[in-house]
Amino acid sequence: MSCYTAILKSVGGLALFQVANGAIDLCRHFFMYFCEQKLRPNSFWFVVVRAIASMIMYLVLGIALLYISEQDDKKNTNNANTNNDSNSNNSNNDKRNESSINSNSSPK
C-alpha cells in the first residue's frame, strides 16, 4: 500500500467519524430537548437517562465502524487471494506450454 493511499484512507475515516459525531450530537440535542420538557434538567433521572442514551449512541457508532473495517479487510483479503490465484494459474499455464513445446520439438 502506498503512502498516499494510507493517507487518503485515514483522512476519509476521520471525515466519516466527524459525520457520525455530528449525527450523534444532533440526536443528543433532540433527546435533551425532549428530556428537558419532560424531566427537570438537574434531576437524577435526567442525568441517568442522558448517560445511558450517550452510551447507546457511542456503542452503535463503535459497532458500525468495526463492521465497516472488517468488511474492508475481507475485501482486501479476497482481492489478494484472487491475485495470487491468477498468478499461480498463469505460472501453471506457462509450465504446460513449455512442456508441450518441448514435446513437440523433440527429434523423431
Swiss-Prot record:
Residues 1-22 form the signal peptide. The chain crosses the membrane at residues 46-66. Residues 76-108 are annotated as: Disordered. Induction: Expressed in the late phase of the viral replicative cycle. Residues 67-83 are virion surface. Its main location: virion. It is a single-pass membrane protein. InterPro entries: Poxvirus_A9. Belongs to the oerthopoxvirus OPG135 family. Envelope protein. Required for an early step in virion morphogenesis. This is Virion membrane protein OPG135. It comes from Vaccinia virus (strain Western Reserve) (VACV).
